Amino acid sequence: MSLEKAVSSAYAAGCRLVFASGAELAAPEDMRVFRCADAHTAVYAALGASLAGRRVLVALGEAVELPDSRVTGGVAVLMPGAGGDFAGLREAFAASESGDAVVALAPDADYAAEADSPETGRYHKQPERFVADCAREEMCPGCPYRGVYYAAAKLWLRTIGDGGCSLLGGKRPFLALDAAWGRGTAAAALAGFTAAMPESVRDTAAVTGAAELTEGALRLLSETGGTLVIVDEKKGGGDPAGLCRRCGLEPVELEANDVNGIEAALRAESTGARAVIVRGECALLHRGGAGRTYETDPNRCRRCGACGRLGCPAISGRSPVIDAAKCAGCGMCAAVCKCSAIRERA
């Protein structure tokens, strides 16, 4: 199948970014083409790039079901069997943007030649449009995602989530999620976003569970850059560190209750791809403190609110009190307290 006319039409429409899987294509020198291992990686990388306001072309060698996602920049997918009736890619991108959806069209149609347009698009934070729904309102006491989002919110990072408990980073007090398309999408979406906005590598991260990692997304991320935080809840026998190394990312490994270490890892300057593995049991399955709980010393507490910004259900009040019945004993509150007012309960 020949994609030459479709690619030329996309370039003329201001598209300078292509994610291709199973499709051979030639592109102008200043059009960046990323080869993806699978269609899933290509599509969600394109959605991440769209978040940056860019027009993005996806070229697939097979027909797949496309996600029902909103877009900022237009996303056009060339794949066999697609029936989109467009005169050219300019019209397809305009339809994607006005319809707020991904559009699909045939790769080998006789698209008309058009005058070239420059690349356009700007990023705007719109979590209400791009974060998947989550029925729960707060993390459990001891949740291993808590320290990650505490640090992300403190550092004002642009953050892409995944599914499951990673969606709780969009709730109060964190409000740290910019986008989340569901399980198994965060790494690919991060790669797409940083491909579209290379200057965002230093202040953009994605958060995903260890079970959601795919080799294709990690290999793409190793090309584009960005920080991927992998929360390993120790539910299975996978080896996320080994998978990262095979894909060219040397991981930093930390415990979930090491809040200050997580913050330091996310604060570190980097212009490439990084993986931060945060290990901790799921709080629903394991009471992390093994009977240990914490309490506040009212004589030392300065009411600074640092422990409250963890969003732990066990902590309440302006002069914080820790409910021993709810406390999981993770010790994150003691780690963020700067005046040593939180200690292990005797």
State the predicted function of each range.
Residues 190, 241, 255, 259-302, ...:
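Redox cofactor-anchoring modules in respiratory/redox and cofactor-processing assemblies
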Residues 302-323, 328, 332-346:
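Iron-sulfur cluster-binding cysteine motifs and their immediate structural context
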Residues 25-27, 43, 65-66, 109-112, ...:
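Flexible loop/turn segments at secondary-structure boundaries
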Residues 116-150, 251-258, 264, 273-279:
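Phosphate/pyrophosphate-binding active-site segments
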Residues 17, 24-96, 163-235:
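Thiamine diphosphate
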Residues 3, 14, 24, 127-187:
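Active-site diphosphate/adenylate-binding microenvironment
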Residues 97, 101-128, 345:
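Terminal amphipathic helices with adjacent charged low-complexity linkers/tails
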Residues 71-109, 199, 234-265:
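Conserved thiamine diphosphate
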